[in-house]
């Protein structure tokens, strides 16, 4: 009986040990499967994250290039506009320099000579130009100056003059600003070709 108990104990130990080893093998196998699944998922997630990061980096690069191109275009446009503005200022200054009293006198006399003799006209000038030119124009235009032609001072004109039909809507603008604007519009297409940067 003692052998039977011993055999029984040995059998229980052996069965328990076998069961424990079987259970341990299953646990290890399950752990290996879980570990492999975790590794596969981690690798898959890593690939997905890498692809997403590469995609975002590519999009960022494209957006950066587009932003850079736009910045360059804006810079070119701003530079062209600044150069045009400087050109326009220089043109206005040059035209204003030409508009001295002698030039104004000659221009007014020519315009008055070709204007219809029966029309009454007003010549609108800067206040200082009126006082400087009045006596010279009296000599050249004669008796028409008070009757058919009247000189009118106007603070809004810096250089040059305007001629207007009295009691009419027709007028011609010979101010330095207007002449410079007309010249600028005429020269602008050629000027654009000169400063064309891109």
UniProtKB/Swiss-Prot annotation:
Record-linked InterPro entries: ATPase_V1_Esu
GO terms, biological process: proton motive force-driven plasma membrane ATP synthesis
Keywords carried by this UniProt record: ATP synthesis, Hydrogen ion transport, Ion transport, Transport
Top-rank lineage group of the source organism: Bacteria
Record GO cellular component, one term: proton-transporting two-sector ATPase complex, catalytic domain
GO molecular function term, any single one: proton-transporting ATPase activity, rotational mechanism
Function: Produces ATP from ADP in the presence of a proton gradient across the membrane.
Protein family (similarity comment): Belongs to the V-ATPase E subunit family.
Name this polypeptide is given: V-type proton ATPase subunit E
Organismal lineage: Bacteria, Pseudomonadati, Spirochaetota, Spirochaetia, Spirochaetales
